[in-house]
Structure formats: structure tokens, C-alpha cells
């Protein structure tokens, strides 16, 4: 599965490293590997299908306050949309 990063999500990922939060950075990598292995709605991080205006997207818990938000695009690629804050901030 090809992984595509939205610009905001890429900045989010790099901010964990810049701020010295290696634990959250490693968790994001683990979540992405798990999505590839187990699919979008199963596995670690409490996968959740989002609703309403976020329908078609999923989230997984990175830490207490941050969520990984992602979807599978029309070409079957995993698109990472956000790695910071909670999805209700989208």
C-alpha cells in the first residue's frame, strides 16, 4: 500500500521529532504499519470510522490528546491527513 502524506500531516509528524517526542513519533509509525497489516478499521490505537462531514475517514489514538486521521483514496493509497490534535479540529 502506498502512503501519501498531506502537507499538514507531514508537518505534524516532523514536529514530534523537533519537539523531542520520539514516543509519539514511533507510535505513528507503528499505527501506519498496523493499518497496512490489518486494514483501516482493525488493530492497535482504537481505530474509529469517523462520521458526518468526516465520513470515509478513520482515526487512531496516538496519545491522550492526538489522533492519526487517515483514509484510503480512490486509488487504494493510504492518505495520512493529520497527526496532531483531535479529529474534531479538522
Kindly give the residue locations of the regions a language model identified:
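Enriched for short, Lys/Arg-rich terminal
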Residues: 2-4, 11-22, 44, 59-90
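Generic recognition of well-ordered alpha-helical segments
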Residues: 11, 30-33
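A short, surface-exposed loop/turn module that caps and links secondary-structure elements
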Residues: 33-61
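Charged catalytic carboxylate motif
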Residues: 27
